[in-house]
Amino acid sequence: MKITLPEFEKARVLVVGDVMLDRYWHGPTGRISPEAPVPVVKVEHIEERPGGAANVALNSAALGAHAVLLGLTGQDEAADALAGQMAGVKVACDFVRLADYPTITKLRVLSRNQQLLRLDFEEAFHDVDSTLLMGKVEQALPHSDVMILSDYGKGALNDVPSMIQRARAAGIPVLVDPKGTDFEKYRGATLLTPNMSEFEAVVGKVKSEEELVAKGLELVKRFELEALLVTRSENGMTLIREGQPELHLPAQAHEVYDVTGAGDTVISTLATSLAAGKSLDEACALANTAAGIVVGKLGTSTVSPVELANALYTEQETGFGVMSEAQLKIAVQAARLRGEKVVMTNGCFDILHAGHVSYLANAGKLGDRLIVAVNTDESVRRLKGPGRPVNPTERRMAVLAALGAVDWVVPFAEDTPQRLIAEVLPDLLVKGGDYKPEEIAGYAEVTANGGEVRVLNFEDGCSTSDIIKTIRERG
């Protein structure tokens, strides 16, 4: 499956659930306490991160989505710290603050990147009036593309059925990271993301792939779900739907340092990708890739679009296809992190011929990645006159993207790609024809950035205009 990143910034993600504050105390250990047989940690660094549902929202925001977080907290210092953390990453929070409860806080003591102890400060919100949070959900739903229910069993989601019903009535998909064995409360959700332990706690021990799929389908039917995504640690993840073959995605992690928050990354990437327009299969593939990245980090962490692009666009792959400008910028950043040389060219490419193919092949040999910027239909008409282009923008870009020499294809609406070139700033800008380098659009911007501009020769005897003329004469 060839995947490109969606425009995550268009996604509006509503996260509702058990919010937490994760605290980390880091320091060396060099002796045993004289008071008890335990190591003494000299705390040198204190760190705070959003946890639980807050980490889910943080992951969506890290991808570029507009994230809104709803949950229950206390009226305490930890709630203020959590709100400050979320404001810093531009997550809109609307908490129900309760005087008689502490904000759920987990304090971890670490030495040499090894966790020695965890202290939990919490009291489950089981007796809280569910209408307090439901009112905020109803206000947020009209401004959301997807809703995530992040259930850690702490009491914020004590009326899940009503939340699912309201969201589905509004046409908004609901993705649930479940907790416990009572899946009845998730009836009617779009998709559940249990891990293997949670799945087997509901259906019993699974002994084969066939049994996994069969029992997964039973859950899909029984609880009126659209899909079930079972995350299986080192065995990847499996998407199960009624009427379609299962989709198995192998694990992507190269090294596993910490699985803390990996489930949060999976559901947030999945939901954000769906909200940004990706299919369920594509969204699951992106979530699987994100999970492989995040388990290589210590503690609850996030994945950026550049990291995701870097993992998707490996050195061996090519032909990633048509992209928007936003997607292209992320892909270029990822390429540069890998030390790759980015080459860029542009043109109408109305009727692709041997001259074009030869030119693009030569351009591609000059670097590691080749970007082709293509004039839109309106731009071509202004430059070439009535009757052009023969092929619309989408078809021209699709043909170019299929060429082995071409990595990324992007449209531009202006007469020249100068603005786009200034945004991308390729290492090498090439153009075919009889130009002088300084006459080429984007020359000043590229050279000022330390890049190079080069003119390549076109193959003689190949011309789109001549091809069109010949067709008309013979027609």
UniProtKB/Swiss-Prot annotation:
ATP binds at residues 195-198. One of its GO terms (cellular component) is cytosol. Residues 344-475 are annotated as: Cytidylyltransferase. One of its GO terms (biological process) is ADP-L-glycero-beta-D-manno-heptose biosynthetic process. Pathway: Nucleotide-sugar biosynthesis; ADP-L-glycero-beta-D-manno-heptose biosynthesis; ADP-L-glycero-beta-D-manno-heptose from D-glycero-beta-D-manno-heptose 7-phosphate: step 1/4; Nucleotide-sugar biosynthesis; ADP-L-glycero-beta-D-manno-heptose biosynthesis; ADP-L-glycero-beta-D-manno-heptose from D-glycero-beta-D-manno-heptose 7-phosphate: step 3/4. It catalyses: D-glycero-beta-D-manno-heptose 7-phosphate + ATP = D-glycero-beta-D-manno-heptose 1,7-bisphosphate + ADP + H(+); D-glycero-beta-D-manno-heptose 1-phosphate + ATP + H(+) = ADP-D-glycero-beta-D-manno-heptose + diphosphate. Pfam families: CTP_transf_like (PF01467), PfkB (PF00294). The keyword Kinase applies. Keywords: ATP-binding, Carbohydrate metabolism, Kinase, Multifunctional enzyme, Nucleotide-binding, Nucleotidyltransferase, Transferase. Residues 1-318 are annotated as: Ribokinase. The active site is at residue 264. SUPFAM superfamilies: Nucleotidylyl transferase (SSF52374), Ribokinase-like (SSF53613). PROSITE patterns: PFKB_KINASES_1. Its EC number is 2.7.1.167, 2.7.7.70. It comes from the Bacteria. GO terms for molecular function: ATP binding; heptose 7-phosphate kinase activity; heptose-1-phosphate adenylyltransferase activity; phosphotransferase activity, alcohol group as acceptor. The keyword Nucleotide-binding applies. Homodimer. Catalyzes the ADP transfer from ATP to D-glycero-beta-D-manno-heptose 1-phosphate, yielding ADP-D-glycero-beta-D-manno-heptose. In the N-terminal section; belongs to the carbohydrate kinase PfkB family. This is Bifunctional protein HldE. The gene is hldE.
